[in-house]
Amino acid sequence: MSVEKQTAMRRTFAIISHPDAGKTTLTEKLLLFGGAIQLAGTIKSRKAARHATSDWMELEKQRGISVTTSVMQFPYKDYLINLLDTPGHADFTEDTYRTLTAVDSALMVIDAAKGVEPRTIKLMEVCRLRHTPIMTFINKMDRDTRPSIELLDEIESILRIHCAPVTWPIGMGKYFKGIYHLIEDAIYLYQPGKHERVGESERIEGINNPELDKKLGDLASELRNEIELVKGASHPFEREGYLKGELTPIFFGSAINNFGVGELLDAFVKEAPPPQGRETNSRLVKPEEEKFSGFVFKIQANMDPGHRDRIAFLRIASGQYQKGMKAYHVRLKKEIQINNALTFMAGKRENAEEAWPGDIIGLHNHGTIQIGDTFTQGERFKFTGIPNFASELFRLVRLKDPLKQKALLKGLTQLSEEGATQLFRPLDSNELILGAVGLLQFDVVAYRLENEYNVKCVYESVNVVTARWVICDDKAVLERFNQEQSRNLAYDGGGHLTYLAPSRVNLEITMEKWPEIQFSETREH
């Protein structure tokens, strides 16, 4: 099959939401509908041995939150779906942001009782920057919810995106009876039930069908009136607005009861964009090009506790990956052979014989691959737009057992390569300072150092409030700056000079004093 045909049948997307909106449940249900798992392991019963398929890391299993991006591939009808599960927890913004550089569209999950929440607003800002097309699933309709019209108003006013309802709920909470599909003019009746089976919902054709009155009684005429109102007050779905990221189609349902998910998935494969072209520092790379290219957006250490491994996640941008092929590693300016790239089904890994644009493959990494690296078949361009963010929280790392220094350094280096934490080594001391965007990341590092590297540490507060990457083309100025400011300077894990500011005021004064130097909050990988 040609590159064009393989590309056309693929959909690569991420699910974004506030914690507890039901993202992990919906992820499982999509896998269930795609036939990728037989049994949706209700994620709340975490004490049982059955954990959510997409939360594979030990700490995630204990806490019940997704803290790293998981990658899952599954077929649905004539399509192949690549689903990237993003961390719902607020501390993992950076990992989530980079994941959103690797997808062509996103699915936003909103809790019908809570509406738009802070985390959703943050993630929408990222999607807006990239004009990412977004579909919306309003979840938990089987519980007491806010009025649906009110939810649409809130999405439009806070997230600044037009809403186009595709399905509309009939009742809510214990009176939830089903959904009306505005485009199909059909009603799907709700049957609360078997969490683990994909049940066929009873379908009634046409909103004016007398059968509806038999099934719903007075609710039928209420529904007709409400739909008239909804049609008058909302935007009709049009694909162009959706693809530009200006309009979001809205679906209602209950993920835990498998209801409304099939309608969402059908619309998704039909309307969501296939893999798109990608910008580089020299040209736009189109997916249908014959030559292979791709970029690394994530690195994960120790995915398999049985093997001390590091996997680099690469999004294929063009051409075809074939087992054993040679690829050019642009940053290192050298050719490598890729013998055993992996494909993923959330922690289950298989060797990939071939892969196509939109697919995510895992490369075994022995410390030579970094986030943001580009692989091609000889061309020397670099994919752009994969960011690193300055840390906002800092801890001094001290060993409980001084003989474990080597293991500590190895652990911190490998874990910081994943990009969720940053390791800083001050110029004028042997101390190790860990930086993060959120507090939970320190817990994750402490847990993983102890469990994966057998290293116990004490984490102490340190007099640093923020970090900035130092950029200066004038070598003489930079040398003078290094001498005068050495007590506040450190190298990050990638060897980049960083200013560790003891206070905001100090940073402002230093920036004023050194106008020739750029103090950057983000850095392209």
From Swiss-Prot:
GO terms for cellular component: cytosol. Its main location: cytoplasm. Residues 8-276 form the tr-type G domain. Pfam families: EF-G_D2, GTP_EFTU, RF3_C. GTP binds at residues 17-24, 85-89, 139-142. One of its GO terms (molecular function) is translation release factor activity, codon nonspecific. It is found in: Cytoplasm. HAMAP family: Rel_fac_3 (MF_00072). Belongs to the TRAFAC class translation factor GTPase superfamily. Classic translation factor GTPase family. PrfC subfamily. Increases the formation of ribosomal termination complexes and stimulates activities of RF-1 and RF-2. It binds guanine nucleotides and has strong preference for UGA stop codons. It may interact directly with the ribosome. The stimulation of RF-1 and RF-2 is significantly reduced by GTP and GDP, but not by GMP. NCBIfam families: prfC, PRK00741.1, small_GTP. This is Peptide chain release factor 3. It comes from Coxiella burnetii (strain RSA 493 / Nine Mile phase I).
